[in-house]
């Protein structure tokens, strides 16, 4: 057996449609497109969502919600990431210095994900209830 001998099993792959090759083929003349109309023309198709001139669903339904500007400037920091910070005081500047928080972030919030194994002082950074308990359990303290 060689690569040039390989071929699919007989009847497993359908023959391609040969359109416009006489009435005997069943796809002659109009080529399976019917008579006239937009969809019979070349390049003729209605765009997705078009409902024939009726106001489309996506424009009938009201817009809702918004993106909070506060959330866009707040970074989420996992508890386990605090191990990368050198020193025992954790504030926004030290988080930025350790490349945990992007430089353009104005606020940070520490969430309970992972563990902390050393005592740290958290200053000027928000914490979730669980993260606050974990920091205090490890012997650290939180200063607002």
Curated annotation (Swiss-Prot):
Binds to the 23S rRNA. Residues 1-58 are annotated as: Disordered. The keyword Heme does not apply. Residues 1-18 have a biased composition (Basic and acidic residues). Part of the 50S ribosomal subunit. InterPro entries: Ribosomal_uL15, Ribosomal_uL15/eL18, Ribosomal_uL15/eL18_sf, Ribosomal_uL15_bac-type, Ribosomal_uL15_CS. HAMAP family: Ribosomal_uL15. GO terms for molecular function: rRNA binding; structural constituent of ribosome. GO terms for biological process: translation. Belongs to the universal ribosomal protein uL15 family. The keyword Ribosomal protein applies. Signal peptide: none annotated. One of its GO terms (cellular component) is cytosolic large ribosomal subunit. This is Large ribosomal subunit protein uL15. Residues 21-31 have a biased composition (Gly residues). Keywords: Ribonucleoprotein, Ribosomal protein, RNA-binding, rRNA-binding.
């Amino acid at each position: 057996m060689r690569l040039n001998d390989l071929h699919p099993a007989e009847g497993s792959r359908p023959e391609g449609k040969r359109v416009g090759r006489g009435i005997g083929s069943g796809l002659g003349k109009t080529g399976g497109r019917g008579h006239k109309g937009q969809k019979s023309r070349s390049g003729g198709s209605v765009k997705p969502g078009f409902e024939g001139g009726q106001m489309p669903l996506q424009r009938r339904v009201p817009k809702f919600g918004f993106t909070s500007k506060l959330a866009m400037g707040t970074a989420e920091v996992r508890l386990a990431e605090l191990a990368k910070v050198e020193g025992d005081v954790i504030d926004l500047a030290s988080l930025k210095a350790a490349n945990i928080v992007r430089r353009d972030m104005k606020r940070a919030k520490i969430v309970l994900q992972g563990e902390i194994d050393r005592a740290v002082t958290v200053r000027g950074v928000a914490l979730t209830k669980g993260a606050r308990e974990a920091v205090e359990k490890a012997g650290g303290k939180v200063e607002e």
